[in-house]
C-alpha cells in the first residue's frame, strides 16, 4: 500500500532582504512575504502574531517581533526587531510562524541572501597508479548544481603527502581526472582533499 500526504498548509514564500549576515548584533531584519494568487499577506495576516528567527526560538514562542510593514506590489515587507532571532552563522533557513486574522496558523522558511543554496559539490573516487605515466590519478566529479571553482587536489597516505595538482572549473555533474606526476601509491589510509579559495575540503578517504 502507499500513503499519499497532501499538506493542508503549504507554507509562505519568504525571503530575507539585505546582504549582511544576521548576527546577535543585528538590530533590524527585513522579511519579504510574497503575495500569491490566493493570498494577500497585508490583508490576511495578523501582523502582531508573527515571530521570526531560528526554529529553535520560534517553535517555543520566542523569536523576533514585528516593528513595521510596507507593501511592495503584491508582497508585504515586514521589519522585525533583530533581538532574539537565535540565527547563527550556519543557519540555513530561518522560520516564520504566526496567524491569519481568522486565527489559522501560518508558517514558512525564508531564504537568506548570503547562503548558497546551489553549491558545487566535489567528490573523488579511489586514486589509482598509472604505470605508463608514472603518475597517481584520481577522478574528481562535481555533483553540485553550480559550476565549481578551480581547485588544488592533494593526495596523502597516512598523513604523508603524495602529491598535488590543480584542476579547472567543473560544470555541474562534470568529471575530470587529476594527474599527480612522479607519484606512487602504497598501502595505508588514503585521503583526497581539495583546496578552493583557501578552504580545504576532504573529498574522500580510502583504504589502499
Feature locations, PLM:
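Edge beta-strands of extracellular beta-sandwich domains
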Residues: 2-4, 105-113, 200-208
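Short, solvent-exposed loop/linker segments at the N-terminal edge
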Residues: 20-26, 126-133
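Conserved aromatic beta-strand anchor motif in extracellular beta-sandwich/beta-rich domains
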Residues: 52-54, 155-157
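Aromatic sugar-binding surface patches on proteins
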Residues: 70-81, 172-179
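Surface-exposed, short loops/turns at beta-strand junctions within beta-sandwich domains
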Residues: 83-90, 183-188
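Asparagine-centered strand-capping/turn motif at beta-strand->loop junctions
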Residues: 140-145
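Intrinsically disordered, low-complexity Pro/Gly/Ser/Thr-rich segments with frequent PxxP/GP/PP motifs
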Residues: 160-187
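Terminal connector regions
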Residues: 184-208
Amino acid at each position: 500500500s502507499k500513503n499519499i500526504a497532501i499538506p493542508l498548509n503549504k507554507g509562505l514564500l519568504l525571503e530575507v532582504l539585505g546582504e549582511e549576515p544576521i548576527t546577535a548584533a543585528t538590530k533590524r531584519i527585513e522579511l519579504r512575504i510574497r503575495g500569491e494568487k490566493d493570498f494577500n499577506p497585508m490583508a490576511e495576516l495578523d501582523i502582531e502574531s508573527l515571530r521570526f528567527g531560528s526554529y529553535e526560538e520560534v517553535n517555543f514562542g520566542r523569536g523576533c517581533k514585528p516593528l513595521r510593514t510596507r507593501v511592495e506590489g503584491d508582497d508585504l515587507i515586514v521589519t522585525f526587531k533583530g533581538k532574539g532571532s537565535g540565527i547563527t552563522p550556519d543557519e540555513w533557513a530561518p522560520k516564520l510562524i504566526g496567524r491569519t486574522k481568522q486565527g489559522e496558523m501560518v508558517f514558512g522558511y525564508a531564504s537568506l541572501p548570503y547562503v548558497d543554496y546551489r553549491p558545487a559539490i566535489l567528490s573523488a573516487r579511489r586514486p589509482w597508479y598509472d604505470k605508463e605515466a608514472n603518475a597517481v590519478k584520481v577522478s574528481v566529479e562535481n555533483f553540485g548544481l553550480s559550476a565549481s571553482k578551480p581547485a588544488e587536489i592533494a593526495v596523502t597516505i597516512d598523513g604523508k603527502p603524495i602529491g598535488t595538482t590543480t584542476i579547472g572549473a567543473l560544470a555541474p555533474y562534470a568529471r575530470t581526472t587529476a594527474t599527480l606526476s612522479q607519484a606512487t601509491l602504497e598501502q595505508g589510509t588514503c585521503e583526497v582533499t581539495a583546496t578552493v579559495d583557501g578552504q580545504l575540503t576532504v573529498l574522500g578517504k580510502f583504504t589502499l
